[in-house]
Design a protein with these regions (language model features):
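N-terminal accessory segment at the very beginning of proteins
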Residues: 1-190, 196-199, 206-208, 215, ...
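Short, well-ordered coil/turn segments that N-cap beta-strands
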Residues: 197-201, 228-231, 266-269
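A short, structure-level motif marking secondary-structure boundaries and short turns
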Residues: 203-206, 243-245
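Acidic/aromatic-lined carbohydrate-recognition and catalytic surfaces
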Residues: 234-269
Length: 269
């Protein structure tokens, strides 16, 4: 998968498989279970203490459109007070994602109003919180994905994609069902952010473009003159030759190498 951190050494999970006439049960080493009902097909996930965490809606567990390749699954909500958080940067007023229809498809949306979706990030991962207990769900799919978090029906939530596989991971949160454990397990699967260099933690001056070169130098000099800490200055798109990437507008920036060298000597990236 594109999303996994393959640099980690992983142990083969210790999974016990049991079966009855009606279902197949997969149990991990900590006691969490995936219970697969054979007919009609449905899946439910149980915590280490036996509590149902995620459960298919038996009327609509999985949908696959052979003509378009679209896939989706629908889960029952424990109640309307089960609250959802996550999905990365979104243009909603509320932290809660309850009642939202969320699309993951990176989009460069300029000057977007509140409620616009999709925008810049696609993170198909969320937390669910109910009675102080948490679980997490990550949908491992690179196609355009969507999450209906109770918008269509408050009794259920649905997620799917325009194609690909219905490949998702449920994080139980351990015996304590804690958000910390959910995040640890998600990060162990997908990777952790490397420790950034010291300069990246400093003040970074950014806006929609500083140009020409004289203006950039003026900004840098102003920070130093006024003793305002700053480590980075962003140029944005107006340094380019007619907005073509990997080019410089030689009228606005006649000697970019010299400018960058001088800024570096003055402590700017």
């Amino acid at each position: 998968s594109y999303a996994f951190d393959y640099s980690r050494d992983r142990k083969t999970p210790n999974i016990k498989v049991s079966q009855t006439a009606k279902e197949v049960i997969l149990t991990n080493g900590l006691g969490a279970k995936a219970v697969i009902q054979k007919t009609p097909f449905s899946i439910k996930m149980l915590s280490e203490t036996g509590e149902i965490i995620v459960q298919d809606d038996p009327k609509r567990p999985v949908m696959f459109d052979q003509a378009t390749g679209e896939i989706q699954t629908t889960k029952l909500r424990k109640s309307e007070v089960e609250t959802y958080y996550g999905f990365g940067e979104k243009a909603f007023m509320e932290m809660s994602r309850n009642g939202k229809y969320i699309v993951n498809w990176n989009t460069d949306t300029f000057a977007y109003p509140i409620g616009t979706d999709p925008i810049y990030q696609s993170i198909p991962f969320f937390y669910a919180l109910h009675n102080g207990k948490t679980y997490g769900l990550f949908f491992n799919n690179t196609f355009r994905t969507y999450f209906d978090m109770g918008k269509t029906s408050p009794e259920r939530y649905t997620f799917g994609a325009d194609g690909g596989e219905l490949d998702y991971f449920v994080f139980t949160g351990g015996k304590d069902r804690s958000p910390k454990k959910v995040l640890e397990d998600y990060a162990n699967l997908t990777g952790k952010t490397p420790l950034p260099p010291m300069w990246a933690l400093g003040n970074q001056q950014s806006r929609w473009s500083y140009f020409p070169e004289s203006r950039v130098r003026e900004i840098a000099a102003g920070f130093r003159k006024n003793k305002i800490p700053a480590d980075v200055i962003y140029l944005d798109i107006d340094y380019m030759d007619e907005y073509r990437v990997f080019t410089w507008d030689k009228k606005r920036f006649p000697d970019p190498s010299k400018m960058i060298s001088d800024l570096k000597a003055d402590g700017f990236k």
